């Protein structure tokens, strides 16, 4: 959630951020009014409690010399004040709940992102040259089926649409890619974790995933829990309600998990193959740092994504995502998109987001500054490898005979340098 002090000090910036996102700037004024009402309710409750405390203290002396009738009046006055205290405290509770509800509706403040919507991104960099084939390239599913490594038909038979089996070298290719990502993360000082894939509502809400895109999440109604769409959720919740030590620099984790997404808003999109599926595997980086270090940490995560994409030998570009296409938690996000030959375009493989203090404020994650005062931490995340990378690896490394070259960095995991058709 956003910082109330920042909202009071610079409401125009928050309004502009809301407009940049295509969201309601009127929420800012509603929150300012609710915040003022909350502060007035707190003052009223404090004053009433003080009055009641003073009356209770003085009543003891008065009771010693009072007549029975006076004692009854004194007690009645005390009861009346006690009831007023309860009323004021309830008014304070309601006012605080109103502020909290409005805070939860306002997205993070955009920082440096281009204006506009989904198509208004800015290309930051292009790396590699899209391959020029002297044959008609096959898409990843046709390749996967001919190589005997992807089985969508049986995936649908067992689980429904957008499910699949990875077989043989396909399973090894994915596991090798994830293992390579895990090793690179560890080499760069990240602590590797295999995270839970079921989380509580506090963790899901705290990371900002129960807002506009809540319908994308699998909800386990009987248990009041959720399946994660990314290990970011579990890694963010890992230090919830804690004071963490950032004196030696950022605290970095890499989460390996299966991920689940309903793809509720994707009817008819990418129905062929494994580009958009309900279940996939991913290695996700997650950093906690001081707010002033967040921009530099964002670049570190992006550089690691560059390193992994270079290792799997696919042409890609980096885009600066426009404000109107940001998730509610992200102040800024860079996507890396790989070239997909049969679609003649770039498709997203990874993203890395700077969530500033938005998630940590919701989750109660703090650190101590140089003056030993507690401050809200910043959080960042970025994907280091995931299932959909297989799409780009297969298509960009295919050969005229239907075989696919295995990127050199993945050959030790797959045990082959070329995958050959089996049918």
Swiss-Prot record:
ATP binds at residues 261-263, 277, 348-351. Its main location: cytoplasm. GO terms for molecular function: ATP binding; serine-tRNA ligase activity. Its EC number is 6.1.1.11. Residues 1-24, 62-71 have a biased composition (Basic and acidic residues). It is found in: Cytoplasm. GO terms for cellular component: cytoplasm. Catalyzes the attachment of serine to tRNA(Ser). Is also able to aminoacylate tRNA(Sec) with serine, to form the misacylated tRNA L-seryl-tRNA(Sec), which will be further converted into selenocysteinyl-tRNA(Sec). Homodimer. The tRNA molecule binds across the dimer. NCBIfam families: serS (TIGR00414). Belongs to the class-II aminoacyl-tRNA synthetase family. Type-1 seryl-tRNA synthetase subfamily. This is Serine--tRNA ligase. The lineage of its organism: Bacteria, Bacillati, Actinomycetota, Actinomycetes, Mycobacteriales. The gene is serS.
């Amino acid at each position: 959630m956003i910082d109330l002090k920042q909202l009071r000090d610079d409401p125009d910036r928050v309004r502009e951020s809301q407009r940049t996102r295509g969201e309601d700037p009127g929420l800012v004024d509603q929150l300012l009014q609710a915040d003022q009402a909350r502060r007035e309710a707190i003052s009223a409750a404090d004053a009433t409690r003080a009055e009641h405390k003073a009356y209770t203290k003085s009543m003891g002396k008065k009771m010693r010399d009072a007549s029975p009738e006076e004692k009854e009046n004194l007690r009645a006055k005390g009861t009346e004040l006690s009831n007023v205290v309860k009323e004021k405290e309830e008014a304070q509770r309601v006012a605080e709940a109103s502020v909290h509800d409005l805070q939860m509706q306002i997205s993070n403040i955009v920082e440096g992102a281009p204006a506009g919507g989904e198509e208004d991104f800015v290309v930051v960099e292009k790396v590699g040259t899209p391959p020029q084939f002297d044959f008609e390239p096959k898409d990843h599913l046709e390749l996967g089926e001919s190589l005997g490594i992807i089985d969508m038909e049986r995936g649908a038979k067992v689980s429904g649409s957008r499910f699949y089996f990875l077989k043989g070298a396909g399973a090894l290719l994915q596991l090798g890619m994830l293992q390579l990502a895990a090793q690179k993360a560890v080499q760069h000082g990240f602590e590797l974790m295999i995270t839970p894939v079921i989380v509580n509502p506090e963790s899901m809400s705290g990371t900002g995933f129960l807002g506009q895109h809540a319908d994308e999440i699998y909800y386990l109604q009987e248990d009041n829990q959720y399946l994660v769409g990314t290990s970011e959720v579990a890694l963010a919740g890992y230090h919830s309600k804690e004071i963490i030590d950032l004196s030696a620099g950022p605290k970095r984790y890499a989460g390996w998990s299966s991920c689940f997404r309903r793809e509720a808003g994707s009817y008819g999109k990418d129905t062929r193959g494994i580009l958009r599926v309900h279940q996939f595997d991913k290695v996700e980086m997650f950093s906690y740092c001081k707010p002033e270090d967040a921009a530099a940490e964002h670049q570190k995560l992006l550089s690691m994504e560059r390193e992994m994409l270079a290792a799997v030998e696919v042409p890609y570009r980096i885009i600066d995502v426009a404000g109107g296409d940001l998730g509610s938690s992200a102040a800024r996000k860079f996507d890396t998109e790989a070239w997909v030959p049969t679609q003649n375009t770039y498709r997203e493989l990874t993203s890395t987001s700077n969530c500033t203090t938005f998630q940590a404020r919701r989750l109660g994650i703090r650190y101590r500054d140089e003056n030993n005062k507690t401050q809200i931490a910043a959080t960042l995340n970025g994907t280091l490898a995931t299932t959909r990378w297989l799409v780009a690896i297969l298509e960009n490394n295919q050969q005229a005979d239907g075989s696919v070259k295995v990127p050199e960095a993945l050959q030790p995991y797959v045990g082959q340098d070329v995958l050959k058709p089996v049918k």
